[in-house]
Amino acid sequence: KFVAGNDFNYVTTHAQAIQSAKSYNISSCSSMAVESGDVRMSDFNVADIILGLEKNDPNSLGYYKTFSHSMQQHLRNYVSGGGRIFVSGAYVGSDMANEEERNFLADVLRISPDGRLRNNGGMVMGLGMNFGFHDKLNDKHYAATTSDIISPLGNAYCAMKYSNETSAAIAYKGERYRAFTMGF
């Protein structure tokens, strides 16, 4: 039996959640459209960066770096102009290994990778709620079988925790921009 569970409906899922607030218009594009300049991030108030399980894997047939050098530059420019970013991904910190990449995480997302979490039970708490996410392979939804533990830097703070009390999401509200990053 083949169990994949990824029907690539993440844009629809995120759009439906955003739409439920009844306050926002939604557009979507690929990271390649941003990196090539076909889409200008400055045209949007908020960018929802959905990374899922993207990571640089030498065994992969394609290049799936969480934040390519080009994307890092686009995001730096976007936040310097007051943009707001919402980032989610199971390798958001751990895939950024060299000094330049870690500086991007610190300067833009205001996070520091702090390890990986396995077999958490898929529970997160914070912002006045508790909820689960898929952390076991199944045929319905992609699963983040391991997640990033991320720590806040500077004026950022831990907004959500995994069930073992490690940090699952970091929020930052600066003078120029805002960022919210989830490690799952």
Task: Indicate residue ranges for each PLM-predicted region.
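Short, surface-exposed beta-strand/loop micro-motifs that present aromatic residues
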Residues: 147-148, 163-178
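A glycine-rich, often tryptophan-bearing local segment used as a flexible ligand/cofactor-contacting loop or short
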Residues: 56-164
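Sequence-pattern detector for short linear motifs
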Residues: 4, 143-144, 181
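Helical hinge/lid and interdomain linker segments adjacent to catalytic or ligand-binding clefts
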Residues: 2-103
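Short, conserved catalytic or adaptor-binding loops enriched in Gly and charged residues
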Residues: 16-21, 148-153, 172-173
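Short, solvent-exposed polar/charged micro-motifs at secondary-structure junctions
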Residues: 36-43, 126-129, 167-170
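Active-site-proximal beta-strand elements of phosphoester/diester hydrolases
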Residues: 158-159, 176-184
